[in-house]
Amino acid sequence: MRFFLSPPHMGGNELKYIEEVFKSNYIAPLGEFVNRFEQSVKAYSKSENALALNSATAALHLALRVAGVKQDDIVLASSFTFIASVAPICYLKAKPVFIDCDETYNIDVDLLKLAIKECEKKPKALILTHLYGNAAKMDEIVEICKENEIVLIEDAAEALGSFYKNKALGTFGEFGAYSYNGNKIITTSGGGMLIGKNKEKIEKARFYSTQARENCLHYEHLDYGYNYRLSNVLGAIGVAQMEVLEQRVLKKREIYEWYKEFLGECFSFLDELENSRSNRWLSTALIDFDKNELNSCQKDINISQKNITLHPKISKLIEDLKNEQIETRPLWKAMHAQEVFKGAKAYLNGNSELFFQKGICLPSGTAMSKDDVYEISKLILKSIKA
């Protein structure tokens, strides 16, 4: 049997709702199911406003634009993340400043303070990624952004269904972004959602997402926009998937605990932040890891760190499992270490490099059974002990 990292898992009503869309012949972007999808996300997250889009990247791009980010503005960002979290900074020709992570996989608060203090000019925004569904230290980060008048944009692409102090991740900042990509906890095959506190700004983002067409009989444009809206067909899938979101979160968390049970003697599993609930989008584990290795040392590095290699056991494990039709991956390679960002300013402590070297993402599909996880775990132990 083949095991993927995080495959789609349909809830039951997807085909029913898609059939309704086809019967209506309204298969273009926008429509009843897009509206229902937005309403379901608002209800679940308790966010004031929601805008369905074709990706979380589009959501982050629009958030930056309506936040007023322009060329040469400074945007702070998590370094330990996927490139889609930070690429929109480049779309607007702004300057990313990368911040390394702490023991939660998320932005190190002390490094964030240092970056703000030393920036050549006041940063315009912070894109904060909640990696693998884990909550960042929101009390401190929200306060820091408030004190320094920095727009907080939460990249909650991996964190739908995650909470901190009973508040949904993505709803702490001025804007939040969720992903419905094919590998996320629920999916529309491809899609995203921008949520936010300010209705006027979300409506401005909505305007930009539909090519910035003015309200005229003809096509009139006073500004440029994008083709970022979501299809009504995909909206129908989203409505059905939102119906089973909580079930998926509980199953992801169960899978994580199974891995801890079977692999805990040989791997380390990071704890959740106190008063938080991670959706455990992907179960991640660290080999030959000691928490004392984590570095709180602060240093400012202005060059990319390119010579980072995987732990030999991780490289071997990924290949061994691939031969068994089991998909795994290393943890994200940090943005400051990517060639495309060579020369970008970064505040580092070495933690993201350590996690990349020693970490692995394990199969986390919500259709898996405990027996499946046990069999995968046996193969993992066989590989690392060989």
UniProtKB/Swiss-Prot annotation:
Its EC number is 2.6.1.34. It holds the Pfam family DegT_DnrJ_EryC1. The modification N6-(pyridoxal phosphate)lysine is found at residue 184. Pathway: Protein modification; protein glycosylation. Keywords: Aminotransferase, Pyridoxal phosphate, Transferase. Changing residue 131 to F: Does not affect catalytic activity. Disruption phenotype: Cells are impaired for flagella-mediated motility, for invasion of intestinal epithelial cells and for persistence in the chicken intestine. It catalyses: UDP-N-acetylbacillosamine + 2-oxoglutarate = UDP-2-acetamido-2,6-dideoxy-alpha-D-xylo-hex-4-ulose + L-glutamate. The keyword ATP-binding does not apply. GO terms for biological process: polysaccharide biosynthetic process; protein glycosylation. InterPro entries: DegT/StrS_aminotransferase, PyrdxlP-dep_Trfase, PyrdxlP-dep_Trfase_major, PyrdxlP-dep_Trfase_small. Its cofactor is pyridoxal 5'-phosphate. The keyword Transferase applies. Substrate binds at residues 25-28, 56, 179, 227, 325-328. One of its GO terms (molecular function) is UDP-2-acetamido-4-amino-2,4,6-trideoxyglucose transaminase activity. Belongs to the DegT/DnrJ/EryC1 family. Aminotransferase involved in the bacillosamine biosynthesis pathway by producing UDP-4-amino-4,6-dideoxy-alpha-D-GlcNAc (UDP-2-acetamido-4-amino-2,4,6-trideoxy-alpha-D-glucopyranose), a precursor used in the production of the glycan component 2,4-diacetamido-2,4,6-trideoxy-alpha-D-glucopyranose. Required for host colonization and virulence. Involved in the N-linked protein glycosylation pathway. PANTHER family: DTDP-4-AMINO-4,6-DIDEOXYGALACTOSE TRANSAMINASE, TRANSAMINASE. This is UDP-N-acetylbacillosamine transaminase. The gene is pglE.
